[in-house]
Amino acid sequence: MKVTIIGGGNLGTLMGATFAYRGHDVIIHSSKPEKFSEEIEVYGKNEEFLYKGKINKVTNDWKEAIEAADLVWVTVPPQMFVETAKLIKPFTHKGQMIGIVPGAGAAEFAFESLIDDGVRFFGLARVLSIARVKEYGKSVYMLGPAPELLIGSIPAKIANEICQEIQPLFGINCRPVANYLVVAFTPSN
């Protein structure tokens, strides 16, 4: 699967390394692409090396990052949702998956025009793991992986389909919930 991650911080770096390690084509959109190495190493809480993933590209070009992606993960803070949606809209297409992690209330409004255009919009109730950058663009800590992922989507009826498509990215169980609001208002977010 061709996966783009918007945001090269703690979570985006961990997700990029994980998906690349699991054999997917990964692009990270970052404001500082020059700081990233080709491979990102993942470490556990006791400094033990877990794995590394080879990132296909790190870019600050929206078209290059979004246009060919099957799945786009948005890992930026909620206050950046409206601007992010505007910037990626020209390069999204019907059927493309847009995932918010962690899912947040009001994201559905920020991305409403993309949903209206036919993107498959969803959010995770929690993150893959607590993540902390060890060395920016080069390594990251995975501190407490989640036992499973909860997915809520708009429209709600596609949550099971999305779970089936994204579960191989993470290698952990994915469970659909009734609707996006269940994800958006989970107390852990």
Per-range role (PLM):
Residues 1-50, 66:
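NAD(P)+-binding Rossmann beta1-loop-alpha1 motif at the extreme N-terminus of oxidoreductases
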Residues 78-136:
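Rossmann-like NAD(P)(H) cofactor-binding subdomain of soluble oxidoreductases
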